[in-house]
Structure formats: structure tokens, C-alpha cells
Amino acid sequence: MKFDNEQLLKYIGACTSPYHTVDTSLQMLLDSGFIELSLEDEWQLDSGSYVVNVFGTTLFAFHIGKKPEHTLRIASAHTDFPAIRVKPNPITSMKGYTKLNVEMYGGLIENTWLDRPLGAAGTVVLKGKNAFDVDSVLVDTKRPIAIVPNLAIHMNRSVNDGVKLNRQKEMLPILMMERNNEDNPTKPLNNRNNPSLFSESDTQYDEWTKFLADEVDCDPSEILSYEMTLYPTEQGCVLGTEGDFISSPRLDNLTSCFGVLSGIIQARKMNANGVRCAIFFDNEEVGSRTKQGGAGMILPNLIKRVYDALGYSNQEMDSFISKGFMISSDVAHGLHPNYPEKNDITNIPVLNKGLSLKIACSQSYAGDAKAIAIVKGLCEEADAQYQIYVNRSDIPGGSTVGSISSAMLPMRTIDVGLPLLAMHSARELMGAADQEQLNRLMNHFLGGK
């Protein structure tokens, strides 16, 4: 059966913020028969499949087979991606224009965000019963509400020579035109659901707060805080005269999330033995040093809770970890035909030739000789095409969560990922044949013997 890339594109289209990545993935797992657990409850576990929402932006799913002591396997990915985030108190004005004050999340290629219709997605936190009991609501505009316009070439003759953008000045999106007191101050954005929602006293709230209140269908006074990401509203697509490529936002790292999801669902379908886990971390793009990131204690704590609930001792758990294996999945740099000199001279991943095994003696990518050999064997058993990726010696590459998380949970780990062009652009490019190869590996690793 031919692999359906439309399912990948549908998934990416739904995952417009880390919160939505977790929500979409969680629903897929629940639909597949996983049972949701809470971090706040005591766990009573038996053979079966379970999932835990960790602080809204990280997700942990696991399957326990008939013989939990058989093997521990973990696959990881990350839910976040380079983007524009809205600051608190974001409204600023200039000569009749209303703009959003924003900051850059991660290492995005800034000029690729210019002139793109932008939607907004994330979470809005509302007043609850008391200070500790608040309500969180997911928001996705699903339509463009803002744009960062370029400066015309007639006003910037050197633009094609390369222009450095000032993030605080030139990356602020336009939201609307200012209204005076006689105009409806929220007409362009609000009143979509309830034209009479606001009273004259609502002038104490800025246009962004009013807009969010309309999206949530609440009074502006109920909004306490938010985490909102701006995202390109243009959908991903298959392209090329022979359909060889996929162009889409957020391929880094939703391709990995999609592959790991496939694997943990396969573990349930096959009732795989041992303990098979999938962890989707947040904050990889900003260093992982958070409570929900790969550099935190969340994964070791979750693994301990699983084995504690199954009645194993700490010494037995340490033994399972030392014998276990983890695959960390994050994208790699494919050969760019216009910049071939940017890749290594002998380890050159090409689009549509399979996933990349990422190797670095600096350990910016996790792995050792045995881990590399193991994952090669897994790829061969799964009939998953693979390549080797190593950075050029004179161009330092990025890092990812594999080495970070394995330092917190000492087990053999390898970094893999699909090769991309234009990584961290507002739209990235991948080979249309490659997602199937990653899914094959993850299905075999988590769902196999």
C-alpha cells in the first residue's frame, strides 16, 4: 500500500503550536485505545497502553506488554518549532497602524516570515475558582490575522545584497488599523461570535486581549495570561513535476512526532513485549532546560513511575535502563543542490534516499559505535532506507535532545531524522518518499519483537 503523505500534511496542519501538537497527538492515541493518566494521580498499571499530558506541551505514551521485564525501548521527538511568539502587553501603535510586540522563539530564518499571512495558536488561561485552580483553553484562529510586510525595494535598494533585520523594530506584525472612539474599536478582529459581548468599560483592555476574549467567547476581564504562537496559515503541499517533494511549515520536527506516534500505536496493535515508550518533549529549540524539556527530570521520573507501579525495585529498573535503547528523532540537513559545499564531503544525505543517522564525535548528536550498529540493524530488519549524516568539520551544526536526555537517563541512544532543505525557514522542504522510511523504523523499533 502506498504511503499516504496527506495524513502527514493533515497532522502538520492541525499542530499549529506545541499545545496543539500535544492535543492532536493525544487524541490520536486515545482513538487508538490508549488510556489517559494524570501526573497528579497514583498509577495502578497492568498490561496495556497509556498516555500522559505533561504540562500541556509535552506528551508521554507507553505500552506495557505481557512481560514488562523483556526490554525497554524509548523513542523521542519534540513538539516545538521556531516561530514568532506574542509578548505580554503586545499592542503598539505607529501612525494609525496597530502592531504586535513579539519575540522570536528559536533560531528561525527571519526573512522567510515576511509577507506571509499569519494565524495565531496557543493557550489562553482564564480565572478559575482560586489562584491555583485556573482554566486553560486552546485557541487557533485558523485564519490569517497579522502580517510582517517587507520594505519596498525602492526604499531599500540594497535589499537583494542581504539585509539584517532588527527583531524589535522590523519583525513586528501589523494587526489592524487604529480606531478612534467613534468607531467600533474591535470590528476587524472581534464580534465574530457575539457583537454585543463588550461594553464601553472594556476600553481598559487592549485590542489583543479583546481579540482573544472573542476567540475564547469570554469577557476580557477573565483572561489572566496566554502563550500564543504566530504561524503561517498556508498549508503544506506535495510538489514537483513527479511529486517528489513536500513543502510545509513545521517539518522540524512534526515529521518526527508523526513517525514516533506511528511507532507507539504499532506497539499497542502488536501488543509488543516489554515497556515501549514515546516521549514528545517541548523546548528543544531553546535548549531543553525546562520542566517539560529533555534536559529536565521528567523522562527519568516517568520511567521510574512506570516501573514503581509495576512493582519493580530501583535496582531492577536501573538494570532495565542499562539494557534499554532510545532513538531520538529530529531532522537533519540534506544536500542543497545550490550549496553542495555546505555538506560533508563523504557523508551526504539526499532527499528521498531515506532517514539520516546523525553522528558527531562531539556528542552534539547521541550515539556510539554499538548504538550506530544497532540502529543500522533495525533499519535493515524494517526495510527502512537510511543514510549517514555528519557535519562538515569547519561548520558546526546544531544539537538536539538525544545527548541531553540520555545524560539524564543513561542508556544507549542514537539520533536520527529526515533530511530537509531550508531547515528553520517558515516553509521547509523534504523528500516525499522519506516519511515512510522513518515510520517503518519506528513501527519496527517500538512495535517489533
Task: Describe each region flagged by the PLM.
Residues M1-K449:
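N-terminal hydrophobic/helix-forming segments and targeting peptides
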